[in-house]
Amino acid sequence: MDSNTVSSFQVDCFLWHVRKQVVDQELGDAPFLDRLRRDQKSLRGRGSTLGLNIEAATHVGKQIVEKILKEESDEALKMTMASTPASRYITDMTIEELSRDWFMLMPKQKVEGPLCIRIDQAIMDKNIMLKANFSVIFDRLETLILLRAFTEEGAIVGEISPLPSFPGHTIEDVKNAIGVLIGGLEWNDNTVRVSKTLQRFAWGSSNENGRPPLTPKQKRKMARTARSKVRRDKMAD
């Protein structure tokens, strides 16, 4: 096992512990608490994958951080902070929409890279909006926290979330997963739109029809899906 992988996990465990203390003292806002909960799941998955105990890793992580801080000068810290771009937290969803439990009548789940896609295949002929909470850096999507698909009535019918055991994903991972989710929902004649906020930070532009540009791979897949559906309809006739 790579030593850097282990030390990174140990430091992440300790930093999570520090952030938890901030929340316990009621100093964290809603986005801070949301990231804390999701990072907890990620750490559990990484700990299981690495075969490391989180409590023991936290203690070692504390020692690593204390050693770094002891050697770090105030001037170096100022320079580091000045040269590091700050990320922003973008919220399409309210806290209620973000934390609400939902159930699928005909569940389908697919893993696309480091992201998990869940779709309720029982949903048909609905107008659906995709909304997401995510962080942004340099005006581009950095990290997806959670994406959900909502009907006009407010029901949740689909979701994209990071896999706890596979930390880290790219903007292309997110766009590919969105393409898969759209294709799955449109299979049942649903009309899917993507929020302007998500379009702007993921694709760099927004369309009035709510449809982001598809990759060549997604276009080919949707064309195959359409041909298959036409053949199925002809057989039914």
From Swiss-Prot:
Post-translational modifications reported in the UniProt record: Upon interferon induction, ISGylated via host HERC5; this results in the impairment of NS1 interaction with RNA targets due to its inability to form homodimers and to interact with host EIF2AK2/PKR.
Q: Where is this region: RNA-binding and homodimerization?
A: 1-73
Q: What does the UniProt keyword field contain?
A: Eukaryotic host gene expression shutoff by virus, Host cytoplasm, Host gene expression shutoff by virus, Host mRNA suppression by virus, Host nucleus, Host-virus interaction, Inhibition of host innate immune response by virus, Inhibition of host interferon signaling pathway by virus, Inhibition of host PKR by virus, Inhibition of host pre-mRNA processing by virus, Inhibition of host RIG-I by virus, Inhibition of host RLR pathway by virus, Interferon antiviral system evasion, RNA-binding, Ubl conjugation, Viral immunoevasion
Q: Where is the motif Nuclear localization signal annotated in this sequence?
A: 34-38
| Effect after changing residue 146 to A | Complete loss of nuclear mRNA export inhibition
Q: Where is this motif: Nuclear localization signal 2?
A: 216-221
What GO biological process terms does the UniProt entry carry, in alphabetical order? symbiont-mediated suppression of host cytoplasmic pattern recognition receptor signaling pathway via inhibition of RIG-I activity; symbiont-mediated suppression of host gene expression; symbiont-mediated suppression of host innate immune response; symbiont-mediated suppression of host mRNA processing; symbiont-mediated suppression of host PKR/eIFalpha signaling; symbiont-mediated suppression of host type I interferon-mediated signaling pathway
User: Could you name the domain of life of the organism this protein comes from?
Assistant: Viruses
**One of this protein's Pfam families, by short name?**
Flu_NS1
Q: Which SUPFAM superfamilies match?
A: Ns1 effector domain-like, S15/NS1 RNA-binding domain
Segments for region (CPSF4-binding): 180-215
CC per GO annotation: host cell cytoplasm; host cell nucleus
Q: Where is this region: PABPN1-binding?
A: 223-230, 223-237
> Residue ranges for motif Nuclear export signal?
137-146
Tell me the segments the record calls region Disordered: 205-237
Effect upon mutating residue 144 to A:
Complete loss of nuclear mRNA export inhibition
Do the record's keywords include Ubl conjugation?
yes
UniProt main location, coarse: host cell
Question: A single Gene Ontology molecular function, please?
Answer: protein serine/threonine kinase inhibitor activity
Free-text note regarding domains: The dsRNA-binding region is required for suppression of RNA silencing.
What is annotated about its quaternary structure and interactions? Homodimer. Interacts with host TRIM25 (via coiled coil); this interaction specifically inhibits TRIM25 multimerization and TRIM25-mediated RIGI CARD ubiquitination. Interacts with human EIF2AK2/PKR, CPSF4, IVNS1ABP and PABPN1.
Q: What does this protein do?
A: Inhibits post-transcriptional processing of cellular pre-mRNA, by binding and inhibiting two cellular proteins that are required for the 3'-end processing of cellular pre-mRNAs: the 30 kDa cleavage and polyadenylation specificity factor/CPSF4 and the poly(A)-binding protein 2/PABPN1. In turn, unprocessed 3' end pre-mRNAs accumulate in the host nucleus and are no longer exported to the cytoplasm. Cellular protein synthesis is thereby shut off very early after virus infection.
Task: Give the family, as the similarity comment puts it.
Answer: Belongs to the influenza A viruses NS1 family.
Name-wise, this protein is Non-structural protein 1
Give the originating organism. Answer: Influenza A virus (strain A/Udorn/307/1972 H3N2)
- Give the classification, highest ranks: Viruses, Riboviria, Orthornavirae, Negarnaviricota, Polyploviricotina
